[in-house]
């Protein structure tokens, strides 16, 4: 495998508002060509509800002072906020020879594998994307594929204020109970979770050569 195809660039973005990162990953994806590098963006967002393309307004119960943004990913409404790890895999899945369903499985399995390091038994569900522990949801997924390339990604609850989830039906499921790593004895900080999950995700994708960066690409 050529070096370009086997190298994964990891960008650590820190805490950012949702909209600017969303527009940056749209721009990155729209301007990709066959030589563009694959990247994973690791970020923590300020509080926001995002409504996916399948989203129905009745699932947003009482947003209050938290903004609601309609976005171009799959899925329904979810919440992002401090203490939650968000990872955006910006991958040329055509070049990697990975199908969309296969990519979802790789992402879910990487979370399961990461939590297994902490003796937490997690699992995916065929009918409801995400990762669960004892029927409570610890991670949400929502992807978009454009020109054979992925953007958007996953959100893992680590150590956060969970109360905003009560203002919505998470992922369109009324009464869906959410849980976080801190309660489970998993990683206790976003930084720790990010380090572990980048490892298991790159292993799942078969990409061993990792190059770390701080901040967005200079071209954005």
Curated annotation (Swiss-Prot):
GO CC terms of this entry: cytoplasm
Role this protein plays: Catalyzes the transfer of endogenously produced octanoic acid from octanoyl-acyl-carrier-protein onto the lipoyl domains of lipoate-dependent enzymes. Lipoyl-ACP can also act as a substrate although octanoyl-ACP is likely to be the physiological substrate.
Record protein name field: Octanoyltransferase
This enzyme's EC code(s): 2.3.1.181
Family in the record: Belongs to the LipB family.
Originating organism: Shewanella piezotolerans (strain WP3 / JCM 13877)
InterPro entries xref list: aa-tRNA-synth_II/BPL/LPL, BPL_LPL_catalytic, Octanoyltransferase, Octanoyltransferase_CS
Any matching Pfam family: LplA-B_cat
GO molecular function terms listed in the Swiss-Prot or TrEMBL record: lipoyl(octanoyl) transferase activity
Catalytic reaction(s) noted: octanoyl-[ACP] + L-lysyl-[protein] = N(6)-octanoyl-L-lysyl-[protein] + holo-[ACP] + H(+)
PROSITE patterns per record: BPL_LPL_CATALYTIC (PS51733), LIPB (PS01313)
Active site annotation, chain numbering: 171
Localization per record: Cytoplasm
Pathway: Protein modification; protein lipoylation via endogenous pathway; protein N(6)-(lipoyl)lysine from octanoyl-[acyl-carrier-protein]: step 1/2
Note from the entry: In the reaction, the free carboxyl group of octanoic acid is attached via an amide linkage to the epsilon-amino group of a specific lysine residue of lipoyl domains of lipoate-dependent enzymes.
SUPFAM superfamilies: Class II aaRS and biotin synthetases
CDD domains in the record: LipB
BPL/LPL catalytic domain sequence ranges: 34-209
Keyword check for Nucleotide-binding: no
Residues reported in the UniProt entry to bind substrate: 73-80, 140-142, 153-155
Top-level division of the source organism's lineage: Bacteria
Positions marked as site (Lowers pKa of active site Cys): 137
Example of a GO biological process term: protein modification process
Keyword vocabulary terms for this entry: Acyltransferase, Cytoplasm, Transferase
Acyltransferase is among the record's keywords: yes
């Amino acid at each position: 495998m050529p070096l370009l195809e086997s190298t994964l660039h990891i960008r650590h973005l820190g805490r950012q508002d949702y909209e600017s990162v969303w527009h940056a990953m749209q721009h990155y994806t729209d301007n990709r060509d066959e030589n563009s590098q694959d990247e994973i963006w690791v970020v923590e967002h300020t509080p926001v509800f995002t409504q996916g393309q399948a989203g129905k307004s009745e699932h947003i119960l009482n947003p209050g002072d938290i903004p609601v943004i309609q976005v171009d990913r799959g899925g329904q409404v979810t919440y992002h906020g401090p203490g939650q790890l968000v990872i955006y895999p910006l991958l040329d899945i055509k070049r990697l020879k990975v199908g969309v369903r296969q990519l979802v499985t790789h992402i879910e399995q990487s979370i399961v594998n990461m939590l297994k390091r902490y003796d937490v038994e997690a699992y995916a569900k065929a009918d409801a994307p995400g990762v669960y522990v004892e029927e409570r949801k610890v991670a949400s997924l929502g992807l978009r594929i454009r020109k054979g390339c992925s953007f958007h990604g996953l959100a893992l609850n680590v150590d956060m204020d969970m109360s905003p989830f009560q203002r919505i039906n998470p992922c369109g499921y009324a009464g869906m109970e959410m849980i976080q790593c801190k309660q489970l004895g998993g990683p206790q900080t976003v930084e720790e979770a990010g380090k572990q999950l980048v490892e298991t995700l790159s292993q799942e994708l078969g990409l061993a050569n990792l190059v770390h960066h701080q901040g967005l690409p200079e071209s954005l």
